[in-house]
Amino acid sequence: MLKSLCAALAMSVITLTAFGASSAFAEPLKVVASFTVIADFAKNVGGDRVDITTIVGPDGDAHVYEPSPADAVAMAKADIVLVNGLHFEGFLQRLVDASATKASIITLTKGVTPIDFKPEFADADAAEGAGTGDGKTVTDPHAFQSIANARIYVKNIAEAFCAADSDGCVSYQTNAAAYTKKLDALEGEVKAAIQSIPEAKRVVITSHDAFGYFEHEYGLTFLAPQGISTDSEPSAADVAKLVEQVKQDKASAIFVENITNPRLIEQIASETGIKVGGTLYSDALSQPDGPGSTYIDMMHNNIRQIKGAILGS
């Protein structure tokens, strides 16, 4: 009888231990990502150990986003909040205050070398907390447009997940390493595509100045009527100045962005005689069935659109 009772107790301990381990694994980290690019990075690093909520969704504009009550609830429940920083998310502090979140807020641009930006079109740089509207130098927050910086984001995410979930650290590090290899391959493809474009043709127009890091890293020149934020419209004088500059610099292609109204770009295309070459993904990924539903797909789409519009292929 005693032997049977001991055996039963032992089985109970084993069952409870297994159940406890299963329950612990069944509770993924609750992660809030400020926008879709970060959410994609987090998914690749975290796998099934993380449950991700994205604040600014596909084709959304983080510069002008207004948080919802559901966003505040998600923030309040989060273990980790992943943000870009560099004043990209103008809504962030309001959302943190409204949610009273206790989550760790991880700024993924830590370790990135920021690019300072002096707007050529002074009326269009009034980003919340970033631009001044007076033509002064501001910090460009779009660091993720450099694949080298994307690797830094991924490293920071893996470190944050390891700190919050030490049991999953090996998994996070393995996933991050595998994804980084994909980014390495992507960067090679982007550089090869740019090299195939004659230097004299490497001038393009987009809606707002979201591609400064891409320009710095890969050697294209981007012109835009709006500054680093989309939260203000350029003046007629700004548009006229850009049209004149386009004629002087002989831009090779013009593109709309997925997050902006195409009206202004269509106007500039009409006045310069340059055909709109397609859509570039700047501050957000596409819908799941679109051509830029992941970061890697976004970069493939953008370089394919640019190369195709300039070279006619």
Segments (PLM) and residue ranges:
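Positively charged n-region of N-terminal signal peptides that target proteins for export
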Residues: M1-S4
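Bacterial N-terminal signal peptides
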Residues: A7-G20
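Extracytoplasmic metal-acquisition and chelation regions
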Residues: F25-S313
